[in-house]
Amino acid sequence: MKAHKIFWLNLAAIIIISIVVSGDMFLAMKWEQIHLKDGLKKVLSTYPIKNLETLYEIDGHDNPHYENNDQDTWYIESSYSVVGSDELLKEDRMLLKVDKNTHKITGEYDTTTNDRKNATDSTYKSYPVKVVNNKIVFTKDVKDPALKQKIENNQFLIQSGDLTSILNSNDLKVTHDPTTDYYNLSGKLSNDNPNVKQLKRRYNIPKNASTKVELKGMSDLKGNNHQDQKLYFYFSSPGKDQIIYKESLTYNKISEH
């Protein structure tokens, strides 16, 4: 009888300890997420950069491994892609090079279209542009007035978005490596998020499409300056091709594509 009582007391103690430890671990993980979100808020609060020409006076994350001929250069890239089950069907891409030495912004707007049934019908076009007085200007004549207006009105989310609002979602996971300063955010966003609303309106994306977001970059999470980062929005609707919007801001190196 005594041994039986001791067994149940030990079992109860183990259960209580497990509950306490689990609770402490849950609180620790929750506190870590709050701390990381606060750090990311400092980083994202440095946006929007409404005038891209202000980047002439802004230094980024310095890296001694970058090529010397790329020093003091910002690269801004965005792309809107329609992706089938296993292939890229359509992509519009803007890439700008912000040269801090010459105070010039140049780049190109590319369009790619792949026919799902006939690969030989794929098309690629590139339109060279520059930025003058914070406005996109063509360096060669464009015949299509609709395309011309579309490109001239192009804006990046770092110019017109509300990036800190991403952190308001309750369905996010944030990780940060203090050794490398690499961070990653991923999760879901509601249709009420202002960035989601803006992208759906701009690209005529179905209003009921679900949205996943991913943010990657390098930062000490202190918000001291603009850092390299990549932002992804994934829009999905049942029976529809996936739509992906990507945007990146990098310093001293050519943006990956």
UniProtKB/Swiss-Prot annotation:
Its main location: membrane. It is found in: Cell membrane. GO terms for cellular component: plasma membrane. Signal peptide: none annotated. Keywords: Cell membrane, Membrane, Transmembrane, Transmembrane helix. InterPro entries: Csa (IPR007595), Csa_sf (IPR038641). This is Uncharacterized protein SAOUHSC_00172. The chain crosses the membrane at residues 6-26. It is a single-pass membrane protein. Belongs to the staphylococcal tandem lipoprotein family. It comes from Staphylococcus aureus (strain NCTC 8325 / PS 47).
